[in-house]
Amino acid sequence: MFEIKAKDNRGRVGVLKTNSGDVKTPNLMPVIHPRKQTIDVKKYGADIVITNAYLIYKDEDLKKKAAEIGLHKLINFDGPIMTDSGSFQLSVYGDVDITNKEVIEFQELIKTDIGTSLDIPTAPFVTREKAEADLEVTLERAKEAVDYRNSQNMEMKLNSVVQGSTFPDLRRKCADELTKLDADLYPIGAVVPLMESYHYKELVDVVMNSVAHLPDSKPRHLMGAGHPMIFALAVAMGCDLFDSAAYILYAEDDRLLSVRGTYKLENLQEMPCSCEVCCNYTPDDLRAMPKEKRRDLIAQHNLNVSFAELRLIRQAIYEGSLMELVEERCRAHPNLLEALRQLGNYSKDLEKYDPRSKKSAFFYTGSESLYRSEVLRHIQKLRAMPRKRDLVILPPSRKPYSKYVSSKLGNFYVYGSEQELDLNNTDFMVLDIPFGLIPLEIDEIYPLSQNESPRTWDVSSLEFIEDFISEFVEYYDQVLIHSNVIKKLDIGLYNIHSQSDEIRYAKDDLKKVKAIADYQFGVGAGDALFAGNIKIEKSKKTGKIRHIYDGKTLIVNMRASDSFLILSKEGAKRLHAATQYPKNRVVVNKDSEPFSLEGKSVFAKFVVECDEDIRAKDEVLIVNEEDKLLAYGKALLGACEINDFQTGQAIKTRKGMKK
């Protein structure tokens, strides 16, 4: 029903399959009023819409027509349709005269594609007692709806809505309980008041505590989120669908949506974008029009800008630049920036879903970039890597640092008691933003060279660097810090090492590839992969390492774009022999064994388990339940997703081990 096609952070480009067609996500569902609709939303990019089943049910004429001709003909939309159950009316008026079972039955009758149970929308900041009471009713109705749908063999997909007000633990509880029901989609409800009051920080807590406890294999719908300025942040948190009545409600009030906020027509001197409406009309033109015509044109603009933003977000996911877009969008309003900073508190969760390598470089746009998955991941790996006795800290230079390191390095100040140099027992690292300390032996692997940051460090960068140094100097007997670093950070060291002139970085390709293997596959992988008569072949054009052999037997290729090691059959055998189960492994069932041996790609439904540290784009070993090596390939999903999905590819197999 749902497959992931591309990933970045928790954002994903996916395909939602329904009885009325497929929908690419992230996507927006314009709200269609069954009586008042004046705009053909499909013309402006709508692949899926949402309408209110309760409003149709309450209108005898509409109810009769919908039962006779079906919902699609009633609202003149042949694509997928989601229906709400009347929960919004329940939240506004306090009651609706329809039961949960009746509204499920009616949605099936009118042939909606995705129906919704009658949940209780609990407003933000209510008492805990009310939130808990409402939640129990929501859970009871969700279970009733799923059971009834299944018992009646209904065709429609079913939403189960996550409630819990602004209590993170109640959101988690609700998500956990709904997951057990195995619904088809999971809306996150009662968030409109948070967005209307610019409580975006609280929105982050609500969404993250919901999404983290929902199945990765099902789409999530952020209910009522219709303003394009919030889309990028919401997608980065794992939301796949949005619905919007804002496009028409704002137009009724002469307000134009944009990714920077909302413009009032009365204040506009220039049109805010390059859509068809903005190119063909001036603010004065719109102000001079009859109300209805003006409303429809502004609504068209609002749809245009909303769908344009979603196209941009999907493209950012494809190229791996989603977080750069999020950081840009969240500077449109101080409360959004606060929300972005709050999202940094969830970096450990986000890291599980972020691919190891991306098509785009990492751009540092501010202190918030320091909390991104790539930075956290590097720090974790650096802490786990083996260390030598001494550490030399160098200032940043042109990238890759190891290629341009000078033969004469300059003066070095000593942290701790001075000892005689032992360059064979010394780690050389560059100090730079945003990754802190970068060992020269691994500096070409993504994203340690594939990043850009301002040469002028901001206060947050300086604090980050100082904390980094404070931690890592304690791991070494002697730390030698370059004079330029001392000056830049105003470090109070005054003793220049007596052998400063003798400090040299000796490039060693074998040590380099071993260090990269340890960084990529885990400590010990380098020695296991590169034992024997190792020969390293470089590109004549670029000088980069391309192939590594034991004699004439290929072990790995090094990918030029990110310096990741790509296993050959021999490399896979060596890594498998040297690592403990389930490290670097994806375990498939017996049905998949013969196909894996032949080099066929692995589908998620055949996976029994996998290493929990696997991330999308990782090179992995494919084994059976007895740990026999069957094949090797590239993970398309992270471990959490591989274990949860029952559809779609999990591993793109490079080669099977069949003789």
From Swiss-Prot:
Its cofactor is Zn(2+). It comes from the Archaea. Binds 1 zinc ion per subunit. One of its GO terms (biological process) is tRNA wobble guanine modification. One of its GO terms (molecular function) is RNA binding. Its EC number is 2.4.2.48. Zn(2+) binds at residues 273, 275, 278. Residues 583-658 form the PUA domain. Pathway: tRNA modification; archaeosine-tRNA biosynthesis. SUPFAM superfamilies: Pre-PUA domain (SSF88802), PUA domain-like (SSF88697), tRNA-guanine transglycosylase (SSF51713). The active site is at 84 (nucleophile). It catalyses: guanosine(15) in tRNA + 7-cyano-7-deazaguanine = 7-cyano-7-carbaguanosine(15) in tRNA + guanine. Belongs to the archaeosine tRNA-ribosyltransferase family. This is tRNA-guanine(15) transglycosylase. It comes from Methanobrevibacter smithii (strain ATCC 35061 / DSM 861 / OCM 144 / PS). The lineage of its organism: Archaea, Methanobacteriati, Methanobacteriota, Methanomada group, Methanobacteria. The gene is tgtA.
